[in-house]
Amino acid sequence: METWQELKVTVKREGEELVSNLLIELGAQGVAIEDSMDYVGNVDRFGEIFPEVEQQEEIVVTAYYPDTVDVTVVEADLQARISELTDFMDLGELKIGTTALAEEDWADNWKKYYEPARITHDLTIVPSWTDYEATAGEKIIKLDPGMAFGTGTHPTTKMSLFALEQVLRGGETVLDVGTGSGVLSIASSLLGAKEIFAYDLDDVAVRVAQENIELNPGMENIHVAAGDLLKGVEIEADVIVANILADILIHLTDDAYRLVKDEGYLIMSGIIKDKWDMVRESAESAGFFLETHMVQGEWNACVFKKTKDISGVIGG
């Protein structure tokens, strides 16, 4: 019987995507996230300031490796890669542990994390192996969580989806920066966007996004490519959405302003509480006006507008 190894990494919440991506690059066959925030409150409303809730500052990233992989080498490589990034972000004190799993335990462990989840009024995320019958008006996003990048239920993704549902009216061009799983591109298509261009610096993410897009019929209007933020992009967009780290978002805002059409939107998420002011100042310096600010626990998301009429600005 084939066995698997479960490698658990405890890290500060802000490092979730970074550590997940590193583990996949180091050969993980899948990654699961345990976050206390995932179990707090399932009813969210666009534009509402969410109350602070009791939560842990750390999350657990669990990676799965076949027994043919020497996880001690993975641990050493992970530590080395992260040590190169300590000037970029504080991931806290890394805690790493491993456990052996039988094949059937691997399958069960995967599936216990993932169930169909209604995220917004219209959008429901469904694991690819699940038979799910949509109700009238319900739009289904099929994802394979076994390819990592989360299930689409993380607060940063949920707020991004709420924002897309609010601003998309049909016929728009959307740029999805740091696409990851491709969930925001798929949602944009379901919500009526005419054409979506998805970019990610990580070749693994580009592949994962394309595979997830292919799980959903009628997604021929999504184009996925490797790209460093919006460098070299010359496509005018009605909406730009980016769910990535705050330290990276601030390098996006000038190019976003250049590419967003008048009265268009910039949606940003993935912003940890302590870095909200930095991101807001960057967007406003580029010329955007804040329309909506969302908060869920430690995480912030926002909708900025490129407009000359600021009379309807809500502020944060």
Curated annotation (Swiss-Prot):
According to the record, the segments passing through the membrane are none
Subcellular location(s) per record: Cytoplasm
Q: What cellular-component terms does GO give this entry?
A: cytoplasm
* Domain of life where this protein originates: Bacteria
Q: Which SUPFAM superfamilies match?
A: S-adenosyl-L-methionine-dependent methyltransferases (SSF53335)
Report the enzyme's class at the first EC level.
transferase
Keyword Ion transport in record = no
Task: List the Gene3D superfamilies.
Answer: Vaccinia Virus protein VP39 (3.40.50.150)
Instruction: Name the family.
Output: Belongs to the methyltransferase superfamily. PrmA family.
Known role = Methylates ribosomal protein L11.
Name recorded for this polypeptide: Ribosomal protein L11 methyltransferase
**Origin organism of this chain?**
Streptococcus pneumoniae (strain CGSP14)
State the taxonomy lineage. Bacteria, Bacillati, Bacillota, Bacilli, Lactobacillales
